[in-house]
């Protein structure tokens, strides 16, 4: 299995209106001939750190400047990967860069200038339509997004989908809808429908900032007969639009947008770690750190041809982000993948679809031959049409519904209702259509036979013309031979003269060669002496050149260290800022809890909470809540109510060995922040009893009333 490095290209967009208002400078130079990107550090960067900063140069597989167009990039860089998919390879194209760098424009574009995805669709179906007649294709499309580490189907529904893995299918999204398409327009409509459901939001960097990573997946199956054997190749095309990395200080994100940005940066950090580990050749690659890296596992170091398009901004205000993106891309180009052609996979759906259609056709023929009821024939016919259109295709390659099973059920049970005239007409139309098809086939056969006969007649006429031309040529050649006899005699005389002249020339050439050799020896001796004289000077010049080159390399390495140090410091500052926001929110929640929630209730809530490692969220366990309710109800049912001597307020005791006072509910409203409480609408038990004394109740009546109120509270809680 041959290895293939990830291809990396870089595209730079023009300065936008915001950067122009900020008087940002263009610090990017592109050398498309040598595929190099030169980054000129802005003046403020030089003065703020050190004056020795020099332009940085990065080399990639291809670079495209601000004047490049989507179609030109597709033809030069993306098209070979689409061709590889048709050959049975897996291919991945993904765009990476900071927010607002032009990733979505490169991948999607618009109607006037379509991007990589629509251009891929058009090229894909152009190749399919021009393929040989013995090739059959099945094209299936799916569209998903990764939003806040949750996978969602952008076409069928917006519910969370689980990510699973098995030995035969590898890593897959369970429940992701698959849609069979037959034209590029249908595939583009599928993409437009999903794109409308994608999460976007406005930030200070981008008015339509993508808040999720999206992957459009196209599966192409090709069935072909080679040497009387059917061969099925399955190619998979992943078109990935990554959300941009962003800094909160530049985007101004708050609230939900800030949380989205944190999740985006977290997944991109995991992607960067995977790339670093792959470049280092580590034994353990942390693909499981993020769902993004799990989805791209085959594309990074696996069975796939991968192209990364790094999008950068030319503005001097984005120098740090641009350098980070270029370093990211420079590491990625060192990753080696191991792509292979996927021949006869176990999950090939084109064979299963063909077998399913054949079974339905056999069932339809059997039903018509056995005189089945029109309703049953209609049911099988509808199932056959759905199978032909691919409406019953599932993710696992099975098919919804079984017409044969339904037919058997119809035979065993009583039919409900009579067949309608419309159903009978359907069967008759089906028979008429088959007869028309047979007639059309015979007509085509006669036309082909006629065409073949005409072709044979044309070939015979061509042979006759060729024979006439050949005879004429032979006559001309015979005349030429007769004329050449005299010429041959004259040539023999000339050959003798030329032989003598050639001998004289050879003698002169030998003398010339001897003189030339002597001259060459003298020149060699002279060059040797000259080399001895100049060797010291040349050696000195070479040493000076080596010293200059080494100094330049040292300066470049020092600058790289300084840039990385600055980048690290900025990252730490950004993390501190985010941590400060988190601490502020945590302190606010602590203050609310300490002020308004009793400590005992906080402890109970903490005991009931559980942390979900997969979703990274706290949740209240229903089982623990149920156990807590049952335990509290059990304790309440076993309570005893006593009245201390001289007091009308009850005290509650547990039965049995535990005779300690449990809770004095009459005093729960006291001592809250040592503030004067507002008068509540509902009084506590003790206060109500004090009020009842003013109505002239005796102690027994007060006791009965108190018990009724207490148990009504228990029933309400239960």
Swiss-Prot record:
Domain Kinesin motor as annotated: residue spans: 5-335
PANTHER family, alphabetized: CENTROMERE PROTEIN E, KINESIN-LIKE PROTEIN
Subunit text: Monomer.
Name the UniProt record assigns to this protein: Kinesin-2a
Disruption phenotype: Knockdown of expression by CRISPR interference (CRISPRi) system results in significantly shorter membrane-bound portions of the caudal flagella.
Keywords: ATP-binding, Cell projection, Cilium, Cilium biogenesis/degradation, Coiled coil, Cytoplasm, Cytoskeleton, Flagellum, Magnesium, Metal-binding, Microtubule, Motor protein, Nucleotide-binding, Transport
Compartments where found: Cell projection, Cilium, Flagellum; Cytoplasm, Cytoskeleton, Flagellum axoneme; Cytoplasm, Cytoskeleton, Flagellum basal body
Family named by the database record: Belongs to the TRAFAC class myosin-kinesin ATPase superfamily. Kinesin family. Kinesin II subfamily.
Binding site for ADP: 100, 102-105
Result of changing residue 104 to N: Motor domain mutant, the overexpression of which leads to significantly shorter membrane-bound axonemes of the caudal, ventral and posteriolateral flagellar pairs, but has no effect in lengths of the cytoplasmic portions of the axonemes
Any Gene Ontology CC annotation: ciliary basal body
Source species taxonomy: Eukaryota, Metamonada, Diplomonadida, Hexamitidae, Giardiinae
Domain of life: Eukaryota
Function: Involved in anterograde intraflagellar transport (IFT). Involved in flagellar assembly.
Binding site for Mg(2+): 104
